[in-house]
Swiss-Prot record:
One of its GO terms (biological process) is left/right pattern formation. The lineage of its organism: Eukaryota, Metazoa, Chordata, Craniata, Vertebrata. InterPro entries: CITED (IPR007576). Gene3D superfamilies: 6.10.140.2200. This is Cbp/p300-interacting transactivator 2. It comes from Xenopus laevis (African clawed frog). It is found in: Nucleus. Transcriptional coactivator or corepressor of the p300/CBP-mediated transcription complex. May be involved in sex determination, early gonad development, left-right patterning during embryogenesis and differentiation of the adrenal cortex. GO terms for molecular function: transcription coactivator activity.
Length: 225
């Protein structure tokens, strides 16, 4: 019975082993004269492709690449072409490494353009404030009108900063903030700075040298033996 089953298996799969086709035949590698011949060719193809596949490919992808893109003419691999020339046009190979000198030149050119841009600008920092009167300048969809703080560099003749009320200035502008005199006087009275002439200890730092010289001069001379 066992001999009969082995004979049936051999008749169904003549070029297989233990009733299984070789992977080269399942993947469509073509007809080979003997199992030993296609086994040797399959191993050589696998070795060449495993050598030229990039490092980020896993084993399944490398096997698939070796089985699908192998150059087979009439069932025989093209052995006359060198392996390096055979896989130069592979789509799985990474991009060629560019010269580092070219990258350095491009970086220096970008830095030069960046410096020229910032030196051309009169004020590198942000010196724009939003339009304070949107009714005079209607907005056009996504375009928003801006005007500069300095009227010399502006085109729409905006009002000077000294004439703009402090209530409508942005909170970041400290130099142009206006202080009410009543508030300032209330702070002076609260801190006692209005009685500065009546408090001599506030002037001690300025008259300290004169005070020490006068105090030493007024002391009686003491002679020690």
């Amino acid at each position: 019975m066992a001999d009969h089953m082995m004979a049936m298996n051999h008749s169904r799969f003549q070029d297989g082993t233990n009733g299984l086709h070789h992977p080269a035949h399942r993947m469509g590698m073509g007809q080979f004269p003997s199992p030993h011949h296609h086994q040797h060719t399959f191993n050589s193809l696998m070795g060449e492709h495993m050598h030229y596949v990039p490092g980020n490919m896993n084993s399944n992808n490398s096997i698939r690449h070796a089985m699908v893109t192998g150059n087979v003419n009439g069932g025989h691999p093209n052995g006359s072409i060198a392996p390096a020339a055979r896989f130069n046009n592979s789509q799985f190979m990474g991009p060629p490494v560019t010269n580092q000198g070219a990258q350095l030149t491009a970086s220096m050119q970008l830095q030069k353009l960046n410096n020229q841009y910032f030196t051309h600008q009169p004020y590198p920092h942000n010196h724009y404030i939003p339009d304070l009167h949107p009714t005079n300048h209607p907005l056009n969809g996504t375009n928003q009108h801006f005007k500069e703080c300095n009227p010399k560099h502006s085109t729409g003749l905006p009002p000077s900063v000294s004439h703009v009320p402090a209530a409508i200035l942005p909170p970041g502008v400290i130099d142009t903030d206006f202080i009410d005199e009543e508030v300032l006087m209330s702070l002076v009275i609260e801190m006692g700075l209005d009685r500065i002439k009546e408090l001599p200890e506030l002037w001690l730092g300025q008259n300290e040298f004169d005070f020490m010289t006068d105090f030493v001069c007024k002391q009686p001379n003491r002679v020690s033996c």
